[in-house]
Structures are given as structure tokens and as C-alpha cells.
């Protein structure tokens, strides 16, 4: 539904309208009551895009969700991060990874339910095709308007296989769970 309000919608209650399924909210009355010095920050808060990043953490911060979040925030995007795995690597070699259990990943996503909803989500490093579907279904349940991108990481540049090979049906299920590959 489109929702336009001339009063009553503030930065603190706008997310609740978005969680109810409204595509947009407007708050002219709130902005009108601000001092000129407060206006720029208020507009930025209302208009700042939100991105959900799901992936592994790289100790060097050269890859993974740390690098993704750093780049997105430089562009003015507010990021939420969901950890899927802890990697052991340096700038020269990949030494392994420890995937987080499904329940931990879902728990992290559930903890974000009261945040402003993300417009888009990026799924990066996962340890299984099953995790792609699990993460996507949880995102769709919590944030139904969120567009989901899967950027599959099959193996590292040094040849370490990150994502197990699946059969055709598993691959099709994972791909159909997301909006963009």
C-alpha cells in the first residue's frame, strides 16, 4: 500500500509501518517542526538505504562482510551484518573455515526484526546450498519486501573448496530462493 502521512510519522515509528507491509512512508509534519540545523540529519536518517550482508568474516578485513560493509558505508548505506562462518586466512593463503550452525544464523537474523527493514540483502560465503535457502526464507519472513542477491563463493583463489557441490535439484532450489544471482 502507498502511505502518505502529514503528521504522526517519525523516524522512531516509521519502521513499524514498513514492517506492516507499506512500501513507503512520508513525514512532512515531523520535518516541518525541526530546526534548520536538524533537518539534514533527519532527512539522511529517513532516506538512508539499508543493506543486510550475510557472509564470512576475514581476519584481514580484505574480503567478506567486513569489506562489504566498509564499502557500503562509504556510499552512505546503513549495513546489518550476519555472520555465516569464521575464516582462517591471511593475505597470502586460505587455511580453512568454521561454519556457524544454522540456529546461530537464524538467531542473528531474528535479532534484527525490530530494526528498520533492509531494502536488499547480499548472501556471500555459506557452507552449504541448504544455508542459502535457510537464510533467504528467514529474510523473506522477517523482511518481505527485501530483494535478495546471492553472490556464490564456490572456492577461494588458492583453490580451497568453500561450497560443497550439490546435485541439480539442490542448486535449482538455492537459485530459486533468491531474486538475483
Predicted regions located by residue number:
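Short secondary-structure boundary segments
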Residues: 7-9, 29-30, 83-84, 125, ...
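Small-residue (G/A/S/T)-rich helix-start motifs and N-terminal tracts that mark the onset
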Residues: 46-120
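Short catalytic-loop micro-motif centered on adjacent basic/acidic residues
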Residues: 4-5, 120-124
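Glycine-rich phosphate-binding active-site loops on the catalytic face of alpha/beta enzymes
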Residues: 14-46, 80-88
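Glycine-rich beta-to-alpha transition loops that act as phosphate-gripper elements at the mouths
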Residues: 1-12
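Conserved beta-alpha-beta core of the PfkB/ribokinase-like small-molecule kinase fold
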Residues: 123, 128-181
Amino acid at each position: 500500500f502507498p502511505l502518505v502521512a502529514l503528521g504522526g510519522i517519525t523516524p522512531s515509528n516509521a519502521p513499524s509501518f514498513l514492517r506492516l507491509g507499506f512500501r513507503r512512508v512520508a513525514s512532512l509534519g515531523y520535518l516541518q517542526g525541526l530546526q534548520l540545523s536538524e533537518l539534514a540529519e533527519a532527512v539522511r536518517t529517513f532516506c538512508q538505504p539499508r543493506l543486510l550482508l550475510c557472509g564470512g568474516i576475514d581476519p584481514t578485513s580484505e574480503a567478506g562482510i567486513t569489506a562489504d560493509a566498509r564499502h557500503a558505508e562509504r556510499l552512505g548505506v546503513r549495513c546489518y551484518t550476519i555472520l555465516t562462518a569464521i575464516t582462517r586466512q591471511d593475505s597470502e593463503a586460505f587455511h580453512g573455515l568454521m561454519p556457524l550452525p544454522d540456529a546461530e544464523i537464524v538467531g542473528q537474523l531474528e535479532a534484527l526484526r525490530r530494526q528498520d527493514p533492509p531494502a536488499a540483502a547480499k548472501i556471500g560465503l555459506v557452507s552449504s546450498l541448504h544455508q542459502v535457502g535457510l537464510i533467504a526464507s528467514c529474510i523473506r519472513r522477517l523482511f518481505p519486501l527485501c530483494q535478495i542477491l546471492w553472490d556464490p563463493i564456490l572456492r577461494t583463489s588458492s583453490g580451497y573448496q568453500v561450497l560443497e557441490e550439490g546435485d541439480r535439484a539442490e542448486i535449482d532450489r538455492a537459485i530459486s530462493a533468491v531474486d538475483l544471482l
